[in-house]
Amino acid sequence: MMKQRTIATPVKTVGIGLHSGRKVTISIKPAPVNSGVQFIRVDTPERSVVPATALAVCDTRLASVIQKDGVRVSTVEHLLSACAGLGLDNLLIELDGEEVPIMDGSAASFLFLIESAGIAEQEVPRQFVVIKKPVEVREGDKLARLEPFFGFKLDFTIDFKHPAVDKTGQRFVVDFSEHAYRSEIGRARTFGFAHEVEALREMGLARGGSLDNAIVLDEHRILNNEELRYEDEFVRHKILDAIGDLYLIGHPIVGAYVAEKSGHALNNALLRKLLEDPSSYEISTFAENKAPGAYSQESQPLFF
């Protein structure tokens, strides 16, 4: 039977919040079986616990933000994407501020941090959300869909009218029975446009944003001196975000995700619509030799 997993030993690091610009200490610790991923705001008097769930999402304008009883944790998607990529089910994540640090703008720092701590199997079967019928949400020309598929595959199309993005590719498909998260997705950085960054800073946001943690573009080109990590890094980062957003369902998904110009808001709307219809999914466990290829040792060696 495939088993639940947590981090083997506690690990800690310090980073900067993308929007607040404030230094944040983050500690990732083992958690009991069936507890899921829970954030703990150690800077609040009650050490408030905020579960990482789809129904806890309260804001999706610039990142995925979750809250409970008015206590917020923002920009959770990159860390949750790393948790999904490493096959982690149960974690306690302590923060001394509201925002998960941006690190280098990808999931790479979180992958390294968790791998350095090690991963421990727990003696309880791992649960999966198996998609039983298509579920789709649309907003204008944007869409996000989950459909039955015995594995985990993402097909994402972006549409940015910019020379640098046009040149690198607007669509990417990744099937995790054939590609590993760490090598194909985990290093893709967030990106933004210089004029948008200026506008955000005037609003008191993006104070921690820099060329060290984002790909920044002006009207014609990429401003970073560093080359792209993937030739189609922009769309791969959108997949990284989507994996983190989808992990708010609480379990790994067995199904296919298709998106056109989707973002945090539509991804969360998709999960909420899925949860509203119990006939659209089921919670299952798998014997190791019966598990989807996307979650097997051969295709995802980091899981083991």
From Swiss-Prot:
Molecular functions per Gene Ontology: metal ion binding; UDP-3-O-acyl-N-acetylglucosamine deacetylase activity
Keyword Lipoprotein: no
EC category: hydrolase
Cofactor: Zn(2+)
Catalytic reaction annotation: a UDP-3-O-[(3R)-3-hydroxyacyl]-N-acetyl-alpha-D-glucosamine + H2O = a UDP-3-O-[(3R)-3-hydroxyacyl]-alpha-D-glucosamine + acetate
Protein's UniProt keywords contain Hydrolase: yes
Pathway: Glycolipid biosynthesis; lipid IV(A) biosynthesis; lipid IV(A) from (3R)-3-hydroxytetradecanoyl-[acyl-carrier-protein] and UDP-N-acetyl-alpha-D-glucosamine: step 2/6
Keywords tagged on the record: Hydrolase, Lipid A biosynthesis, Lipid biosynthesis, Lipid metabolism, Metal-binding, Zinc
Pfam families: LpxC (PF03331)
Chain positions recorded as Zn(2+) binding sites: 78, 237, 241
Listed InterPro entries: Ribosomal_Su5_D2-typ_SF (IPR020568), UDP-acyl_GlcNac_deAcase (IPR004463), UDP-acyl_GlcNac_deAcase_C (IPR011334), UDP-acyl_N-AcGlcN_deAcase_N (IPR015870)
Gene Ontology BP term (one): lipid A biosynthetic process
Active site: 264
Superkingdom per UniProt: Bacteria
Record EC number: 3.5.1.108
GO cellular component, one term: membrane
PANTHER family hit by this protein: UDP-3-O-ACYL-N-ACETYLGLUCOSAMINE DEACETYLASE 1, MITOCHONDRIAL-RELATED
Function as written in the Swiss-Prot or TrEMBL entry: Catalyzes the hydrolysis of UDP-3-O-myristoyl-N-acetylglucosamine to form UDP-3-O-myristoylglucosamine and acetate, the committed step in lipid A biosynthesis.
Family designation: Belongs to the LpxC family.
Name by which UniProt lists this protein: UDP-3-O-acyl-N-acetylglucosamine deacetylase
Organism: Polynucleobacter necessarius subsp. necessarius (strain STIR1)
